[in-house]
Amino acid sequence: MTPLAQRLAPRRGWACVALFCLLLILFGTLSPGEPHPEQTFPWDKLQHFSAFALLALTTRLAGLSSLVILPALLLLGVGIEGLQLVIPYRGAEVLDALADFLGILAGLGCHLGGRLMVRLSRL
């Protein structure tokens, strides 16, 4: 295996994980919902936050720039909310898009924090 191929191999693996995360998000958010009672804890917002944090982190580990990831995933989150308007028992919520955005920032922040820790450990 060439040195370049060795460097890119982990990124391909993370790209596969990111694609899997994306497919799970699309399936989970665009499948028709079921009526359910109001919840006292906002599990839905936590799910949005977690899913987009993981997607942002894995796409960053796959080698995409934060400057590409942030607007792309933000558009994805807003687009999903728009599509949910026409899906039975789904609805668009501004707070869902906000949870997506905060999750994206958290995922990118985790990547940045990890890189800083590695650099500091080399001092």
Summary of predicted features, one role per range:
Residues 1-59:
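"…centered on the first transmembrane helix and the immediately adjacent amphipathic helix/loop
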Residues 12-13, 62-70, 93-94:
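Membrane-helix interface segments
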Residues 23-32, 75-85:
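Aromatic-anchored segments of alpha-helical transmembrane domains
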Residues 31-32, 64, 88-89, 115:
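Short helix-capping/hinge motifs at transmembrane helix termini and TM-loop junctions
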Residues 50-66, 104-114:
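Membrane-interfacial alpha-helical segments at the cytosolic side of multi-pass membrane proteins
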Residues 54, 70-78, 97, 101, ...:
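Residue-level signature of the transmembrane alpha-helical core
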Residues 118-123:
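Short, charged juxtamembrane terminal tails flanking transmembrane helices
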